[in-house]
Each structure stands twice: as structure tokens, then as C-alpha cells.
A protein has these predicted regions:
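Conserved beta-strand -> loop -> alpha-helix junction used to position metal-binding or nucleic-acid-contacting
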Residues: 138-152
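Conserved phosphate/pyrophosphate-binding and hydrolysis machinery centered on Walker-type P-loop NTPases
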Residues: 181-185
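GIY-YIG nuclease catalytic motif and its immediate N-terminal context
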Residues: 186-239
């Protein structure tokens, strides 16, 4: 949260009163935010040496899907066998697919000015930024939200790890992550809704505060989270 200071002259000299404004005073209500949840499949783990094989994205507002974007991408290189085993994407599936040169501008248009969300989003953005740099496009400059970082803050004690499959199960996502881009993007969206519900319980109702939440140590929100971390996680009587 941010502290706003007002100075008042009460006769004996100026007095500064600091107060914490409500979330509604601070920015865009989450109910008005458009999120674009993104997932990429690639030939490997490094954007410096590997290529994109599939793009999946879906736009949401207030939990409703507004549109989806999905395409295989011809990486221009042979797919490593372990990638085919992991994703089910074969060389035959991508050989007739468009190249990233055709996909990237369409994806940028689809994302628009939405808040970009992903699970370990830095990985996906590293590939998009590498492609943009190579093709002469600006890097993605939208506001971003990583569900890994948000889950680490809000639900880490409740789950065995922060993998997408674990969190999707925790929040009862009807879409099972399967290393295909659009399904993984939609599963990430269900994780996001679960995390937004938790954040709402801490009083977070505006986008700006949500974006600060993963790193907002020392804030009122953080103190609430720290207190919540001390509470038992299972029903029953605790002495």
C-alpha cells in the first residue's frame, strides 16, 4: 500500500497526517481489468538457443473468457525427442505450421493492452522478447503478473510445490495442464482466479495492489499474510 500525507495548519504550526487510502482510491478495480493468460511450448529451456513450437493465450475479464489464441509454430529446427514425449507435438505437426514471423504480430494484437499473466512468466516472455528483437518488434511492455510469485506469497504452506499441475489441482481447475499451450494457459487462468479470491480476502481489490503483492514486504497486506501463515491449515480445535 501507499501512504498519502496531508499537511494541516492547526494554529500551532503545520501538522502532517499520514493516512492509508482505501484500495478503491488507488487504481483500477480488478473487476475492470482484462487479463491475457499466456503459455508457450518450446524446443528447450533457453531463448538464446531454442525456438517456440506452440502459442496459447486467452483473454479474460471478471473470470469470463473473451477470446482465445492458439497456433502451432514451425520452429525451423528438428524437435528434440524429449520435447515430443513431453508435449505430444511431433515434427509432422509443425512442418506446415506458420513461422514465428507470422505468429508474433497476430499475438501482439491479441494481447493488446491486457495485463499479461503466466506461470513462470519470465520463461515465456524471454522467448517472445527474443523473437521480437530478432524481427524488429518492441518487447512486450504490458504490466505482468506471474502466478508462481503470487502463489508463493498466498498459498505456499498449503501445497507441496508450485508447479502448475499442483496448483491447478489445488484450485480444482476443470482444465488439466498437459504441456499444450492453450490448455496450460486456461489452467493458469483457473489458478489465477483462486489466487485472486485469496488476495481479495486480504483486502486487495485494485490492480496496482495485486501487482505489488508478491514483493510488498512490510505492507499491511504482508502483515495480514504473515498472520494468516500462523493459522492452522486444517479444521479442528487447536490449543
Amino acid at each position: 500500500g501507499r501512504c498519502i500525507e496531508h499537511m494541516f495548519d492547526v494554529g500551532s504550526g503545520p501538522v502532517t497526517i499520514a493516512y492509508q487510502p482505501s484500495f478503491d482510491d488507488l487504481g483500477m478495480p480488478l473487476s475492470e481489468v482484462t487479463f491475457c493468460v499466456l503459455d508457450l511450448e518450446t524446443t528447450g529451456g533457453s531463448a538464446a538457443t531454442c525456438e517456440i513450437t506452440e502459442v496459447g493465450a486467452a483473454r479474460y475479464r471478471m473470470g469470463e473468457e473473451l477470446g482465445a489464441f492458439q497456433t502451432l509454430v514451425n520452429p525451423g529446427v528438428a524437435l528434440p525427442p524429449f520435447i515430443t514425449v513431453l508435449t505430444g507435438i511431433t515434427q509432422a505437426m509443425v512442418v506446415e505450421a506458420p513461422r514465428i514471423e507470422a505468429v508474433l504480430p497476430a499475438l501482439i494484437e491479441f494481447i493488446g493492452d491486457a495485463v499479461v499473466v503466466g506461470h513462470n512468466l519470465r520463461f515465456d516472455l524471454s522467448f517472445l522478447d527474443a523473437a521480437a528483437r530478432r524481427l524488429g518488434y518492441p518487447k512486450v511492455s504490458n504490466r505482468t503478473l506471474d502466478t508462481v510469485a503470487l502463489a508463493r506469497r498466498l498459498v505456499r504452506p498449503e501445497v507441496r510445490n508450485l508447479k502448475l499441475s499442483t496448483l491447478a489441482g489445488h484450485f480444482r481447475s476443470p482444465v488439466t495442464p498437459n504441456h499444450r499451450a492453450l490448455d496450460d494457459a486456461r489452467a493458469t487462468a483457473y489458478v489465477l482466479w483462486g489466487l485472486l479470491e485469496r488476495a481479495g480476502g486480504l483486502g486487495v481489490t485494485a490492480l496496482e495492489d495485486l501487482l505489488q503483492l508478491p514483493t510488498a514486504r512490510g505492507s499491511a497486506h504482508y502483515r495480514k499474510i504473515a498472520l494468516a501463515d500462523d493459522l492452522p491449515r486444517r479444521p479442528g480445535v487447536y490449543m
